[in-house]
Swiss-Prot record:
Pfam families: Interferon. PANTHER family: INTERFERON BETA, TYPE I INTERFERON. Belongs to the alpha/beta interferon family. Disulfide bonds join C32-C129, C61-C155, C68-C168. SUPFAM superfamilies: 4-helical cytokines. The gene is IFNA3. InterPro entries: 4_helix_cytokine-like_core, Interferon_alpha/beta/delta. Keywords: Antiviral defense, Cytokine, Disulfide bond, Glycoprotein, Secreted, Signal. Residues 1-31 form the signal peptide. This is Interferon type A3. It comes from Gallus gallus (Chicken).
Length: 193
């Protein structure tokens, strides 16, 4: 006669579940660890590429009245996930505007391609990090921040169109883009140290 199998002890299930949960959390945490070394150099290297790509325009430009102001105090956060989402959003907008076929002739196209590749790769890394952190946290990103950033970049696009993508209009956008790279530096530096 066969001996009936003893029922699995509930504590055994708990240990198995805890082991699986810890493994999932370790995998999720490591998904964002690869960003730390990149954060240290991404903004600096991107700014350098940007300077090489888009030198300051030598001609004097009339003062443009671009009403594309941005209150950068809303970017202040110590929440790493929010900083990552904000950085991701900014980079997507920068990529869109800098990949325009109407960039000025004096911009170095190979440097521009290098910068766009760098932005694209970093954005992909952020997406992986955000996808994995979404399994742990459902913290909502402030909608007004997303809309404010979107409105600002929409204003820059309109400004370029209204000024027929002139070199002077691009000079204004160049200055704005430089400021955005500095914002990204502050976002990534303040939340990952």
């Amino acid at each position: 006669m066969a001996v009936p199998a003893s029922p699995q002890h509930p504590r055994g299930y708990g240990i198995l579940l805890l082991t699986l949960l810890l493994k999932a959390l370790a995998t999720t945490a490591s998904a964002c660890n690869h960003l730390r070394p990149q954060d240290a150099t991404f903004s600096h290297d991107s700014l350098q590429l940007f300077r090489d790509m888009a030198p300051t325009l030598l001609q004097l430009c009339p003062q443009h009245n671009a009403s594309c102001s941005f209150n950068d105090t809303i970017l202040d956060t110590s929440n790493t996930r929010q900083a990552d989402k904000t950085t991701h959003d900014i980079l997507q907008h920068l990529f869109k505007i800098l990949s325009s076929p109407s960039t000025p002739a004096h911009w170095n196209d190979s440097q521009r391609q290098s910068l766009l590749n760098r932005i694209h790769r970093y954005t992909q890394h952020l997406e992986q990090c955000l996808d994995s952190s979404d399994t742990r946290s459902r913290t909502r990103w402030p909608r007004n921040l997303h809309l404010t950033i979107k409105k600002h970049f929409s204003c820059l696009h309109t400004f370029l169109q209204d000024n027929d993508y002139s070199a002077c209009a691009w000079e204004h956008v160049r200055l704005q883009a430089r400021a955005w790279f500095l914002h990204i530096h502050n976002l990534t530096g303040n939340t990952r140290t």
